[in-house]
From Swiss-Prot:
Gene (UniProt): murA2
Keyword Glycoprotein: no
Main location: cytoplasm
Keyword hit for Heme: no
Residue numbers carrying 2-(S-cysteinyl)pyruvic acid O-phosphothioketal: C118
A GO molecular-function annotation: UDP-N-acetylglucosamine 1-carboxyvinyltransferase activity
Superkingdom of origin: Bacteria
Name of this chain's protein: UDP-N-acetylglucosamine 1-carboxyvinyltransferase 2
Organism: Staphylococcus aureus (strain Mu50 / ATCC 700699)
């Protein structure tokens, strides 16, 4: 079957500006959250990615009027109807699990296919289920392809998450906004996207306090009205372009950034010796290789993002000694390593830690196993000698708006082909 590949002829110096898109990890939760509104919602600043289109079509399956126009989405829920959500759309998208919390909150019942997305080893939704049960829901998991969640009544509860989970924190918030009484989430995730979803729900009349801290309190309300809301910029897309600029950029400017959200990466760039200039909502970066070797350990926010450990890896081949990258969040998130070896990389992985030594990369045929691995391979291709061909690029399009066009505009020799 014909498929699209991305091809890159490495060695070009990039310069120019990129406008960072709205946050994928906010958008994929805020779009399901619109079904909690009773009326009309307008979202602005959405990323133009396939995940957004999939979620909009799931809203339409619930008889919601939804109009997606570029970065804007208008939603009218006045004729909403509960329906079982089929598996073919749901399984392509992990964040479809936010439909569970939103539908449980709105209808007290949902039947939904089991979610998919990037294969990153164990990513169970047990903390989500724990939260739903605490609010009074019963879960029927007898089917292998779908899950039925139902509650006679949703009542506020005190919920302690056994592990910090962005998905569970948001999903419990969605289910709890209409619950009677107060819900308290302890050990809640503090990510900016959690705050963004809470701010959106608050804009519709929800009563949520403490988002961005480890304790979130939700007082249930009777009704959520419509709202207009602007999604925050994507800190992972910003971080990825920061890595691209540090690898092969000369005076690359990134606009629409919240500097606080990329502080950990900026600090790591200082250790590496990357030339970074931060002003208000823009960052200017120059390649300043060779870099200093560093150690990186991923942690929950505000620590170093697991989503950036793959994109930063190609930079470490340009360092003056061995670097170590440990992923404490997803210790199996190293499928890019074998692909980088095809390009001549001196890299080994053992028990969740990669050892990365200075290397000269050459073009090769490589396979994007997941979204951020794909970003890593693009950056590797940009600094490699010769032509790199990346297969399975659908993962890349799930998370990066027009990345090929953006890189072309910066001067990269990059194109797509159907093979």
């Amino acid at each position: 079957m014909a498929q699209e590949v991305i091809k890159i002829r490495g060695g070009r110096t990039l310069n120019g500006e990129v406008n960072i898109s709205g946050a994928k990890n906010s958008a994929v939760a805020i779009i399901p959250a619109t079904l909690l509104a009773q009326g009309h919602v307008k979202l602005e600043g959405l990323p133009q990615i396939s995940d957004v289109k999939t979620l909009v079509s799931l809203l339409e399956d619930l008889n919601i009027k939804a109009s997606l126009n570029g970065t804007e989405l208008e939603v009218d829920t006045t004729e909403i109807q509960n329906a079982a959500l089929p598996n073919n759309k749901v399984e392509s998208l992990r964040a479809s699990y936010y439909m569970m919390g939103a539908m449980l909150g709105r209808f007290k019942k949902c039947v939904i296919g089991l979610p998919g997305g990037c294969p990153l080893g164990p990513r169970p939704i047990d903390q989500h289920i724990k939260g739903f049960k605490a609010l009074g829901a019963e879960i029927d998991e007898s089917s292998t392809t779908s899950m039925k969640i139902e509650a006679k009544e949703l009542k506020g509860a005190h919920i302690f998450l056994d592990m910090v989970s962005v998905g569970a924190t948001i999903n419990i918030m969605l289910a709890a906004v209409y619950a009677t009484g107060q819900t308290v989430i302890e050990n809640a995730a503090k990510e900016p996207e959690v705050v963004d979803v809470a701010n959106f729900l608050t804009s519709m009349g929800a009563n949520i306090k403490g988002a961005g801290t480890s304790t979130i309190k939700i007082n249930g309300v009777k009704e959520l009205h419509g709202s207009e809301y602007q999604v925050i910029p994507d800190r992972i897309e910003a971080g990825t372009y920061m890595c691209i600029a540090a690898a092969c950029g000369e005076n690359v400017i990134l606009n629409n950034i919240v500097p606080k959200h990329v502080e950990t990466l900026t600090a790591k760039f200082s250790e590496l010796g990357v030339n970074v200039d931060v002003r208000d909502e823009r960052i200017r970066i120059n390649n300043n290789a060779p870099y200093q070797f560093v150690d990186i350990k991923t942690l929950v926010y505000p620590g170093f993002a697991t989503d950036l450990q793959q994109p930063i890896t190609p930079l470490l081949f340009m360092a003056n000694g061995p670097s170590f990258v440990t992923d404490t969040i997803y210790p199996e998130r190293f499928k890019h390593v074998e692909e980088l070896k095809r390009m001549g990389a001196n890299i080994e992985v053992d028990e969740g830690t990669a050892t990365i030594k200075p290397s000269t990369l050459h073009g090769a045929e490589v396979y994007a196993s997941d979204l951020r691995a794909g970003a890593c391979l693009i950056i590797a291709g940009l600094i490699a000698e010769g032509v790199t061909t990346i297969y399975n690029v659908k993962h890349i399009y799930r998370g990066y708006t027009d990345i090929v066009e953006h890189l072309k505009a910066l001067g990269a020799d990059i194109w797509t082909e159907t093979v």
